Regions:
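FIC/Doc superfamily catalytic core
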Residues: 1-208
Length: 208
């Protein structure tokens, strides 16, 4: 079992002041200056960033490094169906850019559940899927059900919207890790490709 000792840290500041941005991309949006309410949550090393294009570039670099770390971990399903692991993955993906990386959302948004319910539903989600994985043989999982497990986990994880941002990208990566843990593809050659591997433009892939 992988050791998730790279524990996430809480963020500073008032999260209620964050202006959530969508996981989508456009040229007009990219050139928009980062608003002060968002800028305050950049890590000290990123305070020099000015536009969302700058942020997108740094996030892409951070995610690439996070993927490299994830590939080396060899996660099991028990590892992945664990809230600490999921928070650690999010922190690895965004922690070099944002102070809120890996921290559970504490404000209400138009997307996702009420923040007061996140911890409970987050834990219920991983317990449910951990049970499914442990009892797959007894339940009689078909090959199709095995191939859909990662996608189903992705769907329910996105619905909770546990983090301030990056939920879609995080859930897609976790879905690939779930498939990989079952011997169905890998991060390098995923069972269900997202983004460029799926044939979609980058702008559309970030909406998935």
């Amino acid at each position: 079992m992988v050791q998730t000792h790279h524990i996430v840290s809480g963020h500073s500041g008032n999260e209620s002041d964050i202006t959530l941005r969508p996981d989508t991309f456009s040229a007009a949006y990219a050139s928009t200056p980062i608003e002060p309410d968002d800028h305050q949550f950049l890590v000290p090393e990123m305070k020099h960033l000015i536009t969302w294009a700058d942020v997108d570039a740094e996030e892409a670099s951070n995610i690439a490094k996070g993927r490299a770390w994830l590939i080396a971990q060899h996660f099991t399903l028990d590892d992945l169906f664990d809230t600490l692991t999921l928070r650690t993955i999010h922190q690895r993906m965004f922690g070099k850019v944002w102070t809120w990386a890996g921290s559970v959302r504490r404000r209400e948004t138009s997307i996702g559940i009420d923040p007061s319910q996140i911890q409970t539903q987050f834990e219920q989600l991983v317990q449910n899927f951990r049970w499914r994985a442990a009892n797959a043989d007894e339940i009689g999982f078909s090959e199709e059900e095995r191939r859909e497990l990662g996608i189903r986990f992705h769907t329910e994880l996105v619905a909770i919207h546990a983090f301030v941002n990056g939920n879609g990208r995080h859930a897609r990566l976790v879905a690939n890790l779930v498939d990989s843990a079952m011997g169905l593809g890998s991060l390098a050659d995923p069972l269900y490709p997202w983004g460029a591997r799926s044939g979609l433009p980058s702008a559309e892939s970030r909406k998935l």
